[in-house]
Amino acid sequence: MQEGIANNEWQNANEALSKLQEYQKVTSKNILPSDMQIHIEVIYNHLSIFKNLVYFYLILGLFSLFVGLVSIFLSKHSSNLERLIFAIFVFGFLFHTLGLALRWYISGHAPWSDSYESMIYIGWSAALAGVVVFRRSMLTLAASSLLAAIVMLVAHMSFVNPQITNLVPVLKSYWLTVHVSVITASYGFLGLGSLLGIIALVLMIFKNDKNKKELNF
């Protein structure tokens, strides 16, 4: 390294790195990621899937909320627009699923083993809840999208480490895939139910004979 910095000749440094790489492959082949995993991780880092999903869910959630309120208080419905919004939401959910799948392949374990992974998984379950319980109500879709955005935003705060790390020994169990996945996913459904309950209570204040039918979402 010193020779390369001084003379701008990196041949010896490259040879040393190549020898180190070969040594690692021989002595640590069970620990080192494969060439395919490294290639996928580079693609994963360039895509910045979860960071982009924060803006996606936030913008779509606010727009869905606007459309839902307009349909209730102004009695203006557009089935084609609602179907388009739902299709876009499903696309984002599938993109979110792809990100989790890539992280699972890269790390070699289920992607809900630390704080960052748990948050992005809860965001995924919140989006899944919106897909499952959506009944042509933009408020339901808006609540799901905004909840996912908030959870994903918290995941990308400075105190949360997004680095892919080795699985700690205490989590090296099939319970991580079965038990932890179900319990953690339930937070998304619980959060959506709570948020919809708050929205319903607020809308009851404005309920009258004209919008009674629309408010019974």
Task: Please tell me what each predicted stretch does.
Residues M1-F217:
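Polytopic transmembrane helical bundles with strong interfacial aromatic enrichment
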